[in-house]
From Swiss-Prot:
GO terms for biological process: translation. Part of the 50S ribosomal subunit; part of the 5S rRNA/L5/L18/L25 subcomplex. Contacts the 5S and 23S rRNAs. It comes from Xanthobacter autotrophicus (strain ATCC BAA-1158 / Py2). Keywords: Ribonucleoprotein, Ribosomal protein, RNA-binding, rRNA-binding. Gene3D superfamilies: 3.30.420.100. HAMAP family: Ribosomal_uL18_B (MF_01337_B). InterPro entries: Ribosomal_uL18_bac-type, Ribosomal_uL18_bac/euk. GO terms for molecular function: 5S rRNA binding; structural constituent of ribosome. This is Large ribosomal subunit protein uL18. GO terms for cellular component: cytoplasm; ribonucleoprotein complex; ribosome. Belongs to the universal ribosomal protein uL18 family.
Length: 120
């Protein structure tokens, strides 16, 4: 168990280092997923503030989504966070998948954000 957690931490740190190099002043779209929900934030690391956020826990989404743990919910969250980021004037971001592989819900969120108008 400890080796798994260490590998997860190493993978997350590796992704963050690559993002810092590639960012060029762009904010990052950070993804967090649990077994029941998915969360996304657009974070400006230079100023240390969150510019936009969306999650499957929001009341208006909980009634419209079947569950917060499927690819349809992730795609909806991606579109919503893109809409909120565009309202704040953010058009280009760096995608931060954290320690998660780019597959399933994480990929669906990225596709939703691209459809919503974000470029990365």
């Amino acid at each position: 168990m400890a080796k798994d957690l260490e590998a997860l931490a190493r993978r997350k740190a590796k992704v963050r280092r690559a993002i810092r190099v590639a960012a060029n002043g762009r904010p990052r779209l950070s993804v967090h997923r649990t077994s029941q929900h998915i969360y996304a934030q657009v974070i400006d690391d230079a100023n240390g503030e969150t510019l936009a956020a969306a999650s499957s826990l929001e009341k208006d989404l909980r009634t419209s989504l079947k569950t917060g743990a499927d690819t349809d919910a992730a795609k909806t969250i991606g579109k919503l966070v893109a809409e909120r980021a565009l309202a704040k004037g953010v058009t280009a971001v760096v995608f931060d998948r954290g320690a998660y592989i780019f597959h399933g819900r994480v990929k669906a969120l990225a596709e939703g954000a691209r459809e919503g108008g974000l470029q990365f």
